[in-house]
């Protein structure tokens, strides 16, 4: 499996090797051990730009995912899953509001975005699918915690 981590912000220190291990564990737990994933950590300005340009929403958000398996050429290379873009600024604010560690929130957002790329949806597929996604989040996050990654 190949996980590319790009950190485009400096405000919040991030251990990219450790984050890569988190991503690899998530992919393994989801049954994608031979897949490729790109993870970009940016700030609110960067994610706002992506949100505006690609999703038509001119505001920052916590995580955006782009699945490569969608569209006309989705089956071209099924091992390339897609991109997860996370705002470290938003993650830090959400962590502070929830009274949790920044690293924990960052890892959860990586998990959440990766679930979207692999077909899970909590926004458009109804309540049953949202519950299924939340259950998978709890299951894999517990795996990360038990493995000392969070």
Curated annotation (Swiss-Prot):
This protein's record includes keyword Nucleus: no
Main localization of the protein described in the UniProt heading: cytoplasm
Transmembrane parts of this sequence: none
Species of origin: Geobacter sulfurreducens (strain ATCC 51573 / DSM 12127 / PCA)
Cross-referenced Pfam families: YbeY
Residues reported in the UniProt entry to bind Zn(2+): 112, 116, 122
Function: Single strand-specific metallo-endoribonuclease involved in late-stage 70S ribosome quality control and in maturation of the 3' terminus of the 16S rRNA.
Family classification: Belongs to the endoribonuclease YbeY family.
UniProt keyword annotation of Cytoplasm present: yes
Subcellular location: Cytoplasm
Any one GO CC term of the record: cytoplasm
Lineage, opening ranks: Bacteria, Pseudomonadati, Thermodesulfobacteriota, Desulfuromonadia, Geobacterales
Cofactor(s) needed: Zn(2+)
Protein name (record): Endoribonuclease YbeY
Gene that this polypeptide is encoded by: ybeY
Cofactor: binding details: Binds 1 zinc ion.
EC number(s) per entry: 3.1.-.-
């Amino acid at each position: 499996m190949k996980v590319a981590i790009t950190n485009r912000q400096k405000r919040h220190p991030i251990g990219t090797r450790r984050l890569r291990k988190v991503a690899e564990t998530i992919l393994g737990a989801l049954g994608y051990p031979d897949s490729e994933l790109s993870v970009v950590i940016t700030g609110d300005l960067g994610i706002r730009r992506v949100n505006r340009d690609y999703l038509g929403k001119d505001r920052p958000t916590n995580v955006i995912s782009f699945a490569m398996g969608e569209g006309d050429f989705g089956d071209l290379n099924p091992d390339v899953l897609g991109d997860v873009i996370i705002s470290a600024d938003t993650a830090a604010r959400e962590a502070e509001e929830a009274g949790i560690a920044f690293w924990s929130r960052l890892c959860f957002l990586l998990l959440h975005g990766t679930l979207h790329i692999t077909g899970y949806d909590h926004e458009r597929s109804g309540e049953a699918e949202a519950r299924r996604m939340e259950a998978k989040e709890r299951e894999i996050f517990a795996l990360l915690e038990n493995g000392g990654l969070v």
